[in-house]
């Protein structure tokens, strides 16, 4: 079959394109701008069109569109006029879920890292798993693969537009649940209701892996047989949070040493009501949030029969996904890091990790807020998200699919943030010029956001290198 994909330059739709190519289908696609993801698809034989035009769907047997594509999109309208079936991401996920054993990683934060770790652990054990990951993962060489149909298909189960409800997981992870995608879910209760429905799609509750440190995850996965994971220190701070059962997978004695993290893993045996030390694990990721991501991946891989040595080797080797604490480079003694964090909780966790990694250095943070609806709804939560930063700069809002005034909303957000050095800095080019002028040797610049704010760091590092 010939599938034409609208929005093929995005992580989610390019992943679908790779799977379809693996299955032997013909793939074409269109987007407003090419990138490394479309280049990789072209190298595999996909036909990529610039911009959007009804002519691009010629010869297509089916059209695949992202949930964000408007109903009056020219290619979508042309497909319907010609009787070409229009599929959403959920339609393909549902079909694949019926063909494969699915491991689904759901949650507001941490999905990409956890999904990638599980896929890498299965691969390290000699398997050929399928996977769909929402970020480029150098250790796997690609962010989506069909793999061996007899092996599990590991899916980053995105909740946007309730797409994850198309899956019927054999194993599922719930990393955390905290209101997001406010354009789809008008209230926290509405958001949690979707996750509650997702947990019910797991046939056996003991194959549901839940973060016991997260109150939201515990609320939606309220089953005594669900396995829990968490960090000993977090449990000590909030013992009431662990109300389903003792921690089945618990990290203790977490140690950060520069770019490395070590922790001891304790496993609880529900049959003997006792815990045993499984050993010490090492990884190249920093931050408590990444310890939790690692615990979830270890739990899933163990459940799927992967030996401990393969799990430990994969965890130690994992270098992270692109745009997840992604060190872009260093120039003039200034380190520039980019992260996809676009929710206050994600930003807070990323800043804590940066402070642990660079305890003595000045931390300059640039945030490009993502969408007007999210920025407005979570404005109060942003107020205290920058406690670990020394300097905070807020860029214009990245509108994505929404309309509004990027600058006015950014200035309003900057005014709500409780910090003694916070300013709004305009668009990407203006932000790069302003921030570049205040950086000094020894600084760490951290760019945050799900849009194109990473360009601020790229522009600054190019300028610094030209000065040498």
Swiss-Prot record:
It comes from Roseiflexus sp. (strain RS-1). Pathway: Cell wall biogenesis; peptidoglycan biosynthesis. It is an enzyme of class 6 (ligase). Its EC number is 6.3.2.8. InterPro entries: Mur-like_cat_sf (IPR036565), Mur_ligase_C (IPR004101), Mur_ligase_C_dom_sf (IPR036615), Mur_ligase_cen (IPR013221), Mur_ligase_N (IPR000713), MurCDEF_pg_biosynth (IPR050061), UDP-N-AcMur_Ala_ligase_MurC (IPR005758). It comes from the Bacteria. It catalyses: UDP-N-acetyl-alpha-D-muramate + L-alanine + ATP = UDP-N-acetyl-alpha-D-muramoyl-L-alanine + ADP + phosphate + H(+). It is found in: Cytoplasm. The lineage of its organism: Bacteria, Bacillati, Chloroflexota, Chloroflexia, Chloroflexales. One of its GO terms (molecular function) is ATP binding. Belongs to the MurCDEF family. SUPFAM superfamilies: MurCD N-terminal domain (SSF51984), MurD-like peptide ligases, catalytic domain (SSF53623), MurD-like peptide ligases, peptide-binding domain (SSF53244). Keywords: ATP-binding, Cell cycle, Cell division, Cell shape, Cell wall biogenesis/degradation, Cytoplasm, Ligase, Nucleotide-binding, Peptidoglycan synthesis. ATP binds at residues 107-113. One of its GO terms (biological process) is regulation of cell shape. Cell wall formation. The keyword Cell division applies. One of its GO terms (cellular component) is cytoplasm. This is UDP-N-acetylmuramate--L-alanine ligase.
């Amino acid at each position: 079959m010939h599938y034409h994909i609208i929005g093929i330059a995005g992580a989610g739709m390019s992943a679908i394109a790779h799977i379809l190519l693996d299955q032997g289908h013909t793939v074409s696609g269109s987007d407003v701008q090419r990138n490394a993801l479309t280049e990789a698809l072209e190298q595999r034989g996909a036909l990529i069109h610039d911009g959007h035009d009804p002519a691009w769907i010629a010869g297509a047997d089916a059209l695949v569109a992202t949930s964000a594509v408007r109903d009056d999109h020219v290619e979508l309208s042309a497909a319907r006029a010609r009787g070409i079936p229009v599929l959403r991401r959920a339609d393909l996920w549902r079909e694949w879920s019926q063909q494969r054993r699915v491991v689904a990683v759901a949650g507001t934060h941490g999905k990409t890292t956890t999904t990638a770790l599980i896929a890498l652990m299965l691969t390290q054990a000699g398997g050929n798993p399928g996977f769909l990951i929402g970020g480029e993962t150098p250790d796997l060489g690609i962010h989506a693969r069909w793999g061996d149909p007899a092996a599990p298909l590991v899916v980053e189960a995105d909740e946007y537009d309730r797409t994850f409800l198309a899956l019927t997981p054999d194993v599922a992870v719930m990393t955390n649940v905290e209101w997001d995608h406010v354009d789809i879910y008008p209230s926290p209760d509405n958001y949690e209701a979707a996750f509650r429905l997702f947990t019910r799609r797991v046939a056996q509750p003991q194959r549901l892996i839940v973060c016991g440190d997260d109150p939201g995850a515990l609320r939606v996965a309220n089953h005594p047989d669900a396995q829990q994971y968490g960090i000993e220190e977090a449990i000590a701070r909030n013992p009431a949070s662990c109300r389903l059962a003792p921690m089945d997978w618990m990290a203790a004695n977490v140690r950060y040493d520069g770019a490395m993290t070590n922790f001891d893993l304790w496993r609880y045996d529900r049959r003997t009501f006792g815990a045993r030390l499984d050993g010490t694990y090492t990884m190249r990721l920093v931050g408590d949030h990444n310890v939790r991501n690692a615990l979830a991946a270890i739990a899933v891989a163990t459940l799927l029969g992967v030996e401990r040595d393969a799990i430990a080797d994969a965890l130690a080797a994992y270098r992270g996904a692109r745009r997840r604490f992604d060190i872009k480079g260093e120039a003039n003694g200034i380190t520039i890091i980019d992260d996809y964090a676009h929710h206050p909780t994600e930003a807070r966790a990323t800043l804590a990790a940066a402070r642990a990694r660079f305890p003595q250095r000045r931390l300059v943070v640039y945030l490009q807020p993502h969408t007007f609806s999210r920025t407005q709804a979570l404005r109060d939560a942003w107020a205290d998200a920058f406690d670990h930063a020394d300097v905070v700069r807020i860029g214009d809002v990245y509108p994505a699919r929404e309309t509004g005034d990027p600058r006015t909303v950014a200035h309003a957000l900057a005014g709500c943030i409780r910090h003694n050095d916070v300013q709004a800095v305009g668009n990407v080019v203006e932000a790069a010029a302003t921030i570049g002028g205040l950086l000094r040797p020894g600084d760490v610049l951290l760019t945050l956001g799900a849009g194109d704010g990473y360009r601020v760091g790229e522009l600054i590092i190019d300028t610094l290198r030209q000065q040498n």
